[in-house]
Amino acid sequence: MTTDELKSIFQSYCCKDGDSPGKKLFGLEYENFVMIPKVDDTTKTFEPLQVEGDKGVFRILENLADLTKEDNDPLEKVYEKGMLLALKRPSGAKITIEPGGQIELSDAPRNSLSESNESLQNYLRLLKKAVAEFDGE
């Protein structure tokens, strides 16, 4: 495979055309583990939030959806076989739970790094509110 062929494959997969010819958009994916204080631990150490249960990552999806239900671009719940697996916004962003329990934001395509940064900062502020009941970080 030549360098030009490899570049062409990369560009066709990673670069989607925007509203105007020659304009490219890009999307951010951001994964993180939510860490909570260990119970009865005086050393102030943290452990990953459980995947299931009342204090699990799926509860965070519920919290995120509740926090945005009055927004212009709310996070809508996505179920599979009766189980909440993800959230999605009408604008194209998605929040999923990855196999290791990490939470992933797959942001909608953006025009600039500034737009991506603003979106990421908004997501992190929202996530901080969603994990507040767990004393999470």
Report residues per predicted region.
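Terminal catalytic/cofactor-binding subdomain
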Residues: M1-E137
